[in-house]
Each structure stands twice: as structure tokens, then as C-alpha cells.
UniProtKB/Swiss-Prot annotation:
GO cellular component: cytosol
NCBIfam families according to UniProt: hisD
GO terms of biological process kind: L-histidine biosynthetic process
E.C. designation(s): 1.1.1.23
Protein name per UniProt: Histidinol dehydrogenase
InterPro entries: Ald_DH/histidinol_DH, Histidinol_DH_CS, Histidinol_DH_monofunct, Hstdl_DH
Catalytic activity: L-histidinol + 2 NAD(+) + H2O = L-histidine + 2 NADH + 3 H(+)
Record family assignment: Belongs to the histidinol dehydrogenase family.
Keywords per UniProt: Amino-acid biosynthesis, Histidine biosynthesis, Metal-binding, NAD, Oxidoreductase, Zinc
Matches recorded under Gene3D superfamilies: 1.20.5.1300, Nitrogenase molybdenum iron protein domain (3.40.50.1980)
Pfam families (UniProt xref): Histidinol_dh (PF00815)
Originating organism: Nitrosomonas europaea (strain ATCC 19718 / CIP 103999 / KCTC 2705 / NBRC 14298)
Length: 432
């Protein structure tokens, strides 16, 4: 029997218990920080030489020359052609759906002209070059390639550089095939903090990028945190999360599997169910105990559910939505009748999955919306990765002679009030 936490919103100490359940701090490992700082300094100071040494040390001891870290284009094209038909069609279908969704996000430049001829506007420009980090080896995720590369391509990014480690020379054909589908420009077989550093600072072989996106381990996350400001980054993601709001009418086995789908990521992942039906919570608990041993990652799931999972009894669905906003989850399932009527009640969530048939796993792979989502409550102020993350906005201002006179007088008054006489005189010079 798995020991998953049971809470009730009617209990006097519920808020404190909920706070404890949600409390999670990404501890800063001093050894990781020290190692990452050293690696960043090595790459910044010694470039390719350090990159080759670190790649030999951590990933592939058989690499002889720095030129070997770049994969020729025909190798990833070959990986795509070598996939069996079912896998290739699944990747291509997912890519097509992701592309179609993200094309709806594409922003356009705009402007307008005032009566005196003054023109104001906003220019949308794609980033020049983006670096995509993809974990390597057997645990690689081709879906992450699609979710990160396709929005960049839709945005109009000129050059997309992918880095992925190849432990002991092992390459993941699905990842390379995904790179081919997304028309990535260059692929380098490097990983870890050294790959992040190479992308951020540039070396003779690896070009400097404007932004780095993609998931990674603790060393990659620490490196991204350190280089932020030199380059942009997507986000600092915490453990994966799912919150399910259910009215008690869904198959409890479905709900159990939905909770498992996040719990299997790692021991720190969080899976929570909110329901006004106590008997249904009992049935889900039974399903969890019965089904968990059928899964290969059952030990990870068990640890996740026992440490950070919960089945919570609530008064009604309205209260469930209030609690959901308090949690601001990465993924939120509305497994209820007429889920549309509750959407406006949800203010804070990375993604909302409506209805009993809409499992979160579809969003991870092929529904279309991005699976790179804010975690750890940051959905209160953050959004999913999208086309807008690969575009910049530049203000446009053009005033006529009449506009210079009208606006110049206003600017002069305000500038003098701030004690900035040069500002005032600059504005005045256009109309005096």
C-alpha cells in the first residue's frame, strides 16, 4: 500500500498543511556551483581547448580533435530516414501540430500616425541566433527538440544551434531525427555546463548565441543561471507538477495514471488531486496501489507520491479552483462535466487540460501547445515558452515639425522638473 498524503480543506490546519506540501526550495549545491564557475571560466578563457578537454573528461574520451564535435548535416538527415515508419510519422505529426499552434502566436509590427504627422509604432524582430540544449544518451527527449526549436523557427530566428552530449559516443537517433525535422542549422555533440558556456561566450568552433533554451541537469541549470545577462535564457524550471480537479465521475484508473505521468519524472515531481467526493478519493487511492507495480519507474513514482503527492478533499469545485490558483500548477486537468464553465475561475496555471479525455501526456508530445511551462508557482507571473520568447519588440518614434513643437514643450517642462537641463534644451532646440 502506497502512503500518499490525505488532506481536507475543512480541517483547521489545512492552509498550513498545504503550505508545507507546496514548500520546495531549489537548494544551491555549493560543489555544483564551484564546478560550474570553474567550467565557465575555463571556456571563457581558453575556448576550444578547454571545450575539447571537458568533453573528453565528461562525455566522450575518444574524441581527438575539436572539429569532431560538429555533426555533419547528412548524419542527422540519415537518422530521420533510418527511423521506422511509425516513429517517423509520429514525430512529423507532432511537429506539424506544434508548428500550426505556434503560428497563431506570431506577432506583427504595427504603427499609427497622429494628426500632426507624428508616427509611433512597434517593430517586431526575431533573434539572430538561438542555442538549444538537448540532454543526450538514452534518456534524451526528442519532444523537447520539437517544443524548443519549432517556436524559434516560426519566430524567424536566423540560426538555430543545437548542442547534445553523446556519452561514450552514443547518439540518440530520435533526437537527431527531430533536429532534421525542425531544420536545425548546426549540431554539436557537447553537453553540460561547458556546452552552455560555449553557447554563451562563443569559441572559435561554437558560435555565440543570443539566447539559450532547453532542459538539463543541475549543472546545466546552474550554468544557465550564471550566464543569464550575457545571453537570454528560457526559464529556470523546477520539478514537474500536475494538479487534477475532478468531480468524482472520471474513471479512477485514468486519474491514477495521470498522477503517475508526472510522478515518474523524478522523486521531486508533484502530483495532487482535488475532489469534493471522499469516496472517489478512496477509489483513486485503490487504483494507485493496484496499478503502480505495473510501471517500470514504480520506485520513482512511489517516492514522488509519498514525498510530495496528495489527495485533497474539498467542499466543492469552486473551492478547488481557489486552491488551484493558490498552487499555480504547471499542468492543471479539469476532469469534470462542462469544464469550460470553470476556465475563467482558473487564473494561474501553465496549461489547462479540459475534460475527461484530455490527459496531460497529450500536451507533452503532440497536442500542439508548448510543453515548456512555468513551475514552482511561477505560473502566477510567467507563461509557457512560445514564439514571443524568440522575438524582440522595438519602439518606433518619428515626429514632424509640428510634433516636435507640441511634444518638445511637454518634454522640456518635465525635464526641468527632474533637473535635467540638457534634456530640456535638446527638446527646446527643435521648436525655438
Amino acid at each position: 500500500m502506497i502512503k500518499i498524503r490525505r488532506l481536507s480543506s475543512v480541517d483547521d490546519h489545512f492552509q498550513a498543511e498545504l503550505d508545507q506540501l507546496l514548500s520546495f526550495e531549489v537548494s544551491v549545491d555549493s560543489e555544483i556551483e564551484r564546478t560550474v564557475t570553474q567550467i565557465l571560466h575555463q571556456i571563457r578563457t581558453h575556448g576550444d581547448r578547454a571545450l575539447l578537454e571537458l568533453t573528453r573528461q565528461f562525455d566522450n574520451p575518444d574524441i581527438d580533435r575539436i572539429e569532431e564535435i560538429e555533426l555533419p548535416r547528412d548524419e542527422w538527415q540519415s537518422a530521420l530516414m533510418s527511423l521506422d515508419k511509425v516513429q517517423r510519422e509520429a514525430l512529423e505529426q507532432a511537429a506539424s501540430r506544434i508548428r500550426a499552434y505556434h503560428e497563431k502566436q506570431l506577432a506583427q509590427s504595427w504603427d499609427y500616425v497622429e494628426l500632426d504627422g507624428t508616427r509611433l509604432g512597434q517593430k517586431i524582430t526575431a533573434l539572430d541566433r538561438v542555442g538549444l540544449y538537448v540532454p543526450g544518451g538514452k534518456a534524451a527527449y526528442p519532444s523537447s527538440v520539437l517544443m524548443n526549436a519549432i517556436p524559434a523557427r516560426v519566430a524567424g530566428v536566423r540560426e538555430l544551434i543545437m548542442v547534445t552530449p553523446t556519452p561514450k559516443g552514443e547518439k540518440n537517433p530520435l533526437v537527431l531525427a527531430a533536429a532534421a525535422i525542425c531544420e536545425v542549422d548546426r549540431v554539436f555533440t557537447i553537453g553540460g555546463a561547458q556546452a552552455v558556456a560555449a553557447l554563451a561566450y562563443g569559441t572559435t568552433t561554437v558560435p555565440k548565441v543570443d539566447k539559450i533554451v532547453g532542459p538539463g541537469n543541475a549543472y546545466v541549470a546552474a550554468a544557465k543561471r550564471h550566464v543569464f545577462g550575457t545571453v537570454g535564457i528560457d526559464m529556470l524550471a523546477g520539478p514537474s507538477e500536475i494538479l487534477v480537479i475532478c468531480d468524482g465521475k472520471t474513471n479512477p484508473d485514468w486519474i491514477a495514471m495521470d498522477l503517475f505521468s508526472q510522478a515518474e519524472h523524478d522523486e521531486q515531481a508533484q502530483s495532487i488531486l482535488l475532489c469534493p467526493d471522499k469516496a472517489f478519493l478512496d477509489r483513486v487511492a485503490d487504483s494507485i496501489s493496484r496499478l503502480i507495480d505495473t510501471l517500470p519507474r514504480r520506485d520513482v513514482i512511489r517516492s514522488s507520491l509519498e514525498n510530495r503527492g496528495a489527495l485533497i478533499h474539498v467542499r466543492d469545485l469552486e473551492e478547488a479552483c481557489m486552491i488551484a490558483n493558490r498552487i499555480a500548477p504547471e499542468h492543471l486537468e479539469l476532469s469534470v462535466d462542462e469544464p469550460e464553465q470553470w476556465v475563467d475561475s482558473i487564473r494561474h496555471a501553465g496549461a489547462i487540460f479540459l475534460g475527461r479525455y484530455t490527459c496531460e501526456a497529450l500536451g507533452d508530445y503532440c497536442a500542439g501547445p508548448n510543453h515548456v511551462l512555468p513551475t514552482s508557482g511561477t505560473a502566477r507571473f510567467s507563461s509557457p515558452l512560445g514564439v514571443y520568447d524568440f522575438q524582440k519588440r522595438t519602439s518606433l518614434i518619428q515626429v514632424s515639425a509640428a510634433g516636435a513643437s507640441r511634444l518638445g514643450e511637454t518634454a522640456s517642462i518635465l525635464a526641468k522638473g527632474e533637473g535635467l537641463d540638457a534634456h530640456a534644451r535638446s527638446a527646446e532646440s527643435r521648436y525655438q
